[in-house]
Amino acid sequence: MPIRVLDELPAVNFLREENVFVMTTSRATGQEIRPLKVIILNLMPKKIETENQFLRLLSNSPLQVDIQLLRIDARESRNTPAEHLNNFYCNFEDICDQNFDGLIVTGAPLGLVEFNDVAYWPQIRQVLEWAKDHVTSTLFVCWAVQAALNILYGIPKQTRTDKLSGVYEHHILHPYALLTRGFDDTFLAPHSRYADFPAALIRDYTDLEILAETEGGDAYLFASKDKRIAFVTGHPEYDAHTLAGEYFRDVEAGLNPDIPYNYFPKNDPQNKPRATWRSHGNLLFTNWLNYYVYQITPYDLRHMNPTLD
C-alpha cells in the first residue's frame, strides 16, 4: 500500500531515496479510493527515525494508507525538533472522536521504569480504552506489548536481569494463521528489551493465540482470535544500524553493554551490520494491514461506533 502522508513530512524524501512508494496528500486526492486510516502512537525518543522505519513497512501493498501521527507526552523532546512535532503530530484531544482502521503503538525505552512512574501512563491507558471502540485492529510493539498486557489483562511487569539485544531466531507455531502467512518456518528478528514475555505466561493468563516464539521460549508474535489486537515483542521495523546505535550509545554512557547477539559480522562491533530480518518485517506488516485491518474494517468507519455522527 502506498502510504499517504503530508507533502512536507521529512520521511517523504527519505523513503523515496530508497524507492519506497510514498503518495503525498496532493496526489492521493485524485484517486477515488477510501484509504485505510492508520494512526501511529510514537513513543520512541527519536521520532523521525521511528517514523521512517514504520512508514517503510506500511508502504508495500496496493491500497492507500492515510497516516496520522499521535503524541501523548507534552514534555519538551530532547531528540525531535518542536517544529516537527507541531507540524506533523496531533494530540489525543484532536482525534478522540474519530474512528481508525488501525493503530500502531511503538516501543519505548522504559523497560526498567515501573508503569506508574511513566510520565504519560494515564494517557496510555486512555488511548487503549479508546481504541476498543474506535479502532478496528491495534498492533503493539515491544514495550507497548508489556504495557498493553498490564492494562488489558492485568499481567504484572516482567523484567529480565540483563537486556535482550540482538538478532534472534524464531519459529512459527501456526503456519496457516493469517498473520504468519508466507513466513518461513524459522526467521530472524531483532530484539532490544528488558521486558520478559515467557510464552507460558501468555498461555496461562490470556486467551491470546501465540503464533511465533523465540528459540528460548519467549512469545514473539501473538494475537486475539477476533484480530482486534496483535502483539510483536521484537523490533522488526529496525534499520540495519539501529542496534549498533543503541550499543555504542550505551558504551559511551559507561554501561558496559553486551555486544548484540548474532548482529555484527564475526561479533566485531567494527564490522558493518546487515539487516537479515527485512523480508520478515515487510511480510508481517503487510499481513497485519491486509488480514487484520483491510479485510475486517467497515467501509464506513462511522459503523464501527454507532454513537458517533
Swiss-Prot record:
GO biological process: L-methionine biosynthetic process from homoserine via O-succinyl-L-homoserine and cystathionine
Residue positions of the active site: 142 (acyl-thioester intermediate), 235 (proton acceptor), 237
Gene Ontology molecular-function annotations: homoserine O-acetyltransferase activity; homoserine O-succinyltransferase activity
Enzyme category, top tier: transferase
UniProt pathway annotation: Amino-acid biosynthesis; L-methionine biosynthesis via de novo pathway; O-succinyl-L-homoserine from L-homoserine: step 1/1
The keyword Transferase is annotated on this UniProt entry: yes
Gene Ontology cellular-component terms listed: cytoplasm
CDD domains listed in its UniProt record: GATase1_HTS (cd03131)
One Pfam entry name: HTS
EC number: 2.3.1.46
Keyword Transferase: yes
Protein family (similarity comment): Belongs to the MetA family.
Entries under PANTHER family matching the protein: HOMOSERINE O-SUCCINYLTRANSFERASE (PTHR20919:SF0)
Protein name, entry field: Homoserine O-succinyltransferase
Organism of provenance: Salmonella arizonae (strain ATCC BAA-731 / CDC346-86 / RSK2980)
